[in-house]
Amino acid sequence: MWIERNLIASILLFSTSAYAAFKPRIVKKEFDDLLNPIYFNDSSTVLGLVDQTLLISNDDGKSWTNLQEVITPGEIDPLTIVNIEFNPSASKAFVFTASKHYLTLDKGSTWKEFQIPLEKYGNRIAYDVEFNFVNEEHAIIRTRSCKRRFDCKDEYFYSLDDLQSVDKITISDEIVNCQFSQSSTSSDSRKNDAITCVTRKLDSNRHFLESNVLTTLNFFKDVTSLPASDPLTKMLIKDIRVVQNYIVLFVSSDRYNKYSPTLLFISKDGNTFKEASLPDSEGTSPSVHFLKSPNPNLIRAIRLGKKNSLDGGGFYSEVLQSDSTGLHFHVLLDHLEANLLSYYQIENLANLEGIWIANQIDTSSKFGSKSVITFDAGLTWSPVTVDEDEDKSLHIIAFAGENSLYESKFPVSTPGIALRIGLIGDSSDALDIGSYRTFLTRDAGLTWSQVFDNVSVCGFGNYGNIILCCSYDPLLRSEPLKFRYSLDQGLNWESIDLGFNGVAVGVLNNIDNSSPQFLVMTIATDGKSSKAQHFLYSVDFSDAYEKKICDVTKDELFEEWTGRIDPVTKLPICVNGHKEKFRRRKADAECFSGELFQDLTPIEEPCDCDPDIDYECSLGFEFDAESNRCEPNLSILSSHYCVGKNLKRKVKVDRKSKVAGTKCKKDVKLKDNSFTLDCSKTSEPDLSEQRIVSTTISFEGSPVQYIYLKQGTNTTLLDETVILRTSLRTVYVSHNGGTTFDRVSIEDDVSFIDIYTNHYFPDNVYLITDTDELYVSDNRAISFQKVDMPSRAGLELGVRALTFHKSDPNKFIWFGEKDCNSIFDRSCQTQAYITEDNGLSFKPLLENVRSCYFVGTTFDSKLYDFDPNLIFCEQRVPNQRFLKLVASKDYFYDDKEELYPKIIGIATTMSFVIVATINEDNRSLKAFITADGSTFAEQLFPADLDFGREVAYTVIDNWESKTPNFFFHLTTSEDKDLEFGALLKSNYNGTTYTLAANNVNRNDRGYVDYEIVLNLNGIALINTVINSKELESEQSLETAKKLKTQITYNDGSEWVYLKPPTIDSEKNKFSCVKDKLSLEKCSLNLKGATDRPDSRDSISSGSAVGLLFGVGNVGEYLNQDSSGLALYFSKDAGISWKEIAKGDYMWEFGDQGTILVIVEFKKKVDTLKYSLDEGETWFDYKFANEKTYVLDLATVPSDTSRKFIILANRGEEGDHETVVHTIDFSKVHQRQCLLNLQDSNAGDDFEYWSPKNPSAVDGCMLGHEESYLKRIASHSDCFIGNAPLSEKYKVIKNCACTRRDYECDYNFALANDGTCKLVEGESPLDYSEVCRRDPTSIEYFLPTGYRKVGLSTCEGGLELDNWNPVPCPGKTREFNRKYGTGATGYKIVVIVAVPLLVLLSATWFLYEKGIKRNGGFARFGVIRLGEDDDDDLQMIEENNTDKVVNVVVKGLIHAFRAVFVSYLFFRKRAAKMFGGSSFSHRHILPQDEDAQAFLASDLESESGELFRYASDDDDAREIDSVIEGGIDVEDDDEENINFDSR
């Protein structure tokens, strides 16, 4: 503070003759809007843009002229300026308007119109000009014409004469970018006029086909391109940049995902490109930008990553630098701060070589970052301090503009002098703008001093000797405006009061800061009105120092200032082999330094070569920190040196070599620099496992919960985010698939007790705490915001914490505690609150609830009318163990309706809500369904099911399937560990059900062994209890369930056992297969979803079509002894299986099935197995140096990543240390698979595969033949990535209907002979409801006992469901018109009699020739399931006539069977059908993703638990309830792992 007080005192007392006698001349100009001035270089001429009107001043802004009066005098229509371009030296300007374009080649003195032959695509047009650094007359013009956002067309042009004439570049219609190869001053290895362009070809659907790099040396008269064999032509080249001596291509690592990580390909000649090696990144952003480098052979780049924080802040980045080949990068500065707009917090201070100042993320700092500075081009970094006081750190807030990052033609103009805005120490508040200060340095950042106690905008004149500043409020709050200026490099200051309130927004000098003239842009307000005035001040210091010019020969007026000083040793620092000095005016000299518009030239002095700085690792060597030397990479060395004659020789190679381009002198003879490469021993096979990368991270505490975020709405953020919670209630986040984790840090010591994700908006993450605070992220856990909740979460009361709105991410319901001193307090209850602004405010919704649902977003608005604000709540009934269902359309403000007084819960499935109600006997259940929230229909179950009372329901929501029906499990056996029941299938609206399978297994929590095969409709697996009768007997208390696996290929219409493989993984034949036992005694039986540790582990994958895994055994039923289990694999959707390995394994799919990974479960292991060719061959890979106890194997939910994580404990299960192994296969494949979406015969890496029903004789399944695109298994050298394979899915044809396209209708049951027969004593449904549902219908069909499988698309053939049409009420006329009824007279003879005579004749002939001689009618049977062919019907065929007759007879027999069945089932009167509607709910530990269960037990039993309820899990929704005394609360230590996927 002493220094600061004395500085203020000096400002007040300082009075020299120069200050006393001098005041700058000020000219004030007012404009209608803010003026944006731009100087020509070395000139007093300024262009000014005001609201798209261009002005010009030739006297440093003192007077202005409308440029239109200069260019086009007399024209009425104003020129609307689109943009202005300057050449690199800022001596020429090019003005683009909406209609015409103008240029000046003499700094605005004269103007000339020029034309661009643009094919106008839209009304919004942008122009961008790039000039050749060597010859600025040569230019490339890029135009973009847009109709609307993202609907644009780019065109490229070139000019050889300063745009006076412009020609279009016509080498391709799809140019990505073109650049001069001499786009910087240091591009010395290419010809001056070389132009390099990138082109990209897309198909009609805008999918990538190919890229190319085109080069011309004579302005497109001759063009060279990459050969078709070059791998780059098959990669998505996103852009091109010329960086110093290099041409850099930005290449997407996945050609079908432009947001995938960016690869850099480098070339010096523009013809040969090599991929650069970048260090592994913690982030996945594709953004890469370049910095200026002191050596043109060294590339400096910034790579954007991600930041995890609670401040809502942005991203972090890394500063990278290459070696002098441009191919190998290392990190100079990590965790560089950046914001969401990629504005990097780094700058080249005062344009001095090697001096950079940056903000680096520092979580220990109150600001979240710290300012650091380097004086040796990034080799070392040190804190920025004030007045050389290390305890007074300076935190820079505002950095110079983006231009400081890139190549500039302008040299240093203010040597060592800079002003920045910042804060001192951690005591200041970064959010308080009033605490910001203005700081000055005169030694290029070595020391800083405060000059103003507020924010100021400043400009430099006369090379930094004159400084003009104005106070600036970032909030643009008006205050008395004054100028403050210094004539001695900021040591002393004077002020001028301008006499009005306002704010300055910018101070400008000419480009090289040599002029004494300044322009100040201000906004003024009078305090009485909101209207602002815009003033431009021209401030002239030409009369300062009594107009004296410094005598350059007088040393007392100048000093030699060294540009880079070591902050510790205070000695000059060498960068790029040289030191740098400037001759600058001393601060107290009273004269103008140098001549106007004269550039400063540094004085360079070469340094002696330094072995650590001026030498680098040679090609094929990498620096190793442990040995402190360059160690060889044998694969790189051998590929480069072991060629030709050297294949069997020993080659000597230098470990280090001199950095190309360094200016140092006196080469150093390096010790131990030679390495001998024995080429005869380096030829090793390039095995894939050598390219797998594994990392291991450990945390304190056991893993309790982990979640992979599903692909979100923001596609720029890749699907690699993992969130992990431990038993210590800490949360860690990884954005790179588990390679690195960051702990979610918060200010207070808060414990996280649960993690929720929004199923509808996967980017949203919610961290539940043990307090009344909630942490919310809407950007995939990149940052979190703290939200104060109205109460603590009610998780301990057995309720969920949150439910979400389907269409509004800001709307959710919070379930908290009310009046809870403890959970045993009798007054303790739950209270629901609703927010519509993402937690900023809450309103009470309803008290004493178990859960509430936004059901108004569930129903189908196209079919039904309902209130979108409709909410259903399950509300507790005092002193009762059941709930009641209440509804409201206004959040229970005025509207509240009780729908059902006694329920156990509700659930949603598809667009329905299902309610499980309790009957009057208090012992059984009844289910109702609604599709609009107001009309409910009872769900009718098959009448022939003997299940006694209904005790438990599970709704299986096939949300991954396209089936119009859903499955419903009704428990028929509820004894503990002996649970099973009937699997029922609904009709289209969920009101009636038929039996799909009996005795289907279920666990004690209501989850069912039913699992669909993802992405293949109609295929599902179940486990049935084959000893159900034995279990139902009273003598079976010690008997366990015997499970047998079955599979369906027609959505549950028929089920078959899994065919076992012949041999096991050890090539031994299975005994039951050897004995040729039937499938009933010898089939493959697999553990179901209820028996997996993580039910999110599906048997199949949505992206790896047809590939299935399962753990089980071959035999009569599933072996409960784990020692007899093995892992099985199918690549044809379950038709055939292969044993992979013996033991209990976990599995995962990667890259849409090209990578298969398995690891043994619940065992300490260090090795996994993987396959790259769909399971044909398997390899072992050791992923860790020590064995860990495996808990789970996981990857992204879409199974498209090439990264996997193994979650483990260091010791046995329950050990309090989490270990995460990450296994990365990204470098295993050498290329991306080729896919031509337009030409399937283009010879790419894919083939079509068609799923089949093994019971069918043709290729039809569900009424059609379909094909999916899959990578050819043997093409294991390529990966798929985000290739849109689903777009090539095709239906080859629809098939004729067969028996397998039908299932039994309601009240009909499958008989032993394969036919559907009416249940005794029941009546069929009344199908006339279709007339009421669809007013356009003119007919309906009487029930036949059959209904078509909902997923079947078959046409014609066997029509078992519509034999007898009946007209709809009031549609008789239309019905008669359709079927031609009502004819009389002659028409009857023609229409009826003649065909009847023909039929009788044909019938007699067929009877004699076909039926009678083949044994009569006794040989022909009825319709049976599974008898599509007639192979068992051998008929006499002696000639061609016999063959024709027999074919006709067989057809007639089939037809007669259909008629006979209709006769059987049309005798009963049709019953009426109930109307339609829906249901939703909840999760616990991740269970069957498709299950929602209603559980009930005897209300009068002493066990006291009617149903159980736990916290939410979006994958397994269970509808039940918590009765007093029936609550299970998770232990505080949370030892049990909860692989939740909310």
Curated annotation (Swiss-Prot):
Keyword Transport tagged: yes
Cited Pfam families: Sortilin-Vps10, Sortilin_C
Keywords: Glycoprotein, Golgi apparatus, Membrane, Protein transport, Receptor, Repeat, Signal, Transmembrane, Transmembrane helix, Transport
InterPro entries xref list: Sialidase_sf, Sortilin_C, Sortilin_N, VPS10, VPS10-sortilin, WD40/YVTN_repeat-like_dom_sf
Cysteines paired by S-S bonds: none
A biological process from GO: Golgi to endosome transport
Topological domains, Lumenal: 21-1387, 1467-1542
Glycosylated residues (UniProt): 41, 454, 633, 714, 922, 989
Sequence ranges on the Cytoplasmic membrane side: 1409-1445
Segment forming the signal sequence: 1-20
Any single Gene Ontology cellular-component annotation: Golgi apparatus
Positions annotated as BNR repeat: 56-65, 102-112, 373-383, 439-449, 484-494, 732-742, 1128-1138, 1170-1178
Subcellular location: Golgi apparatus, trans-Golgi network membrane; Prevacuolar compartment membrane
Membrane topology: Multi-pass membrane protein
Transmembrane regions: 1388-1408, 1446-1466
PANTHER family: SORTILIN RELATED, SORTILIN-RELATED RECEPTOR
Stated family: Belongs to the VPS10-related sortilin family.
Purpose of the protein: Functions as a sorting receptor in the Golgi compartment required for the intracellular sorting and delivery of soluble vacuolar proteins, like carboxypeptidase Y (CPY) and proteinase A. Executes multiple rounds of sorting by cycling between the late Golgi and a prevacuolar endosome-like compartment.
Protein name, as recorded: Vacuolar protein sorting/targeting protein 10
Organism for this UniProt entry: Komagataella phaffii (strain GS115 / ATCC 20864) (Yeast)
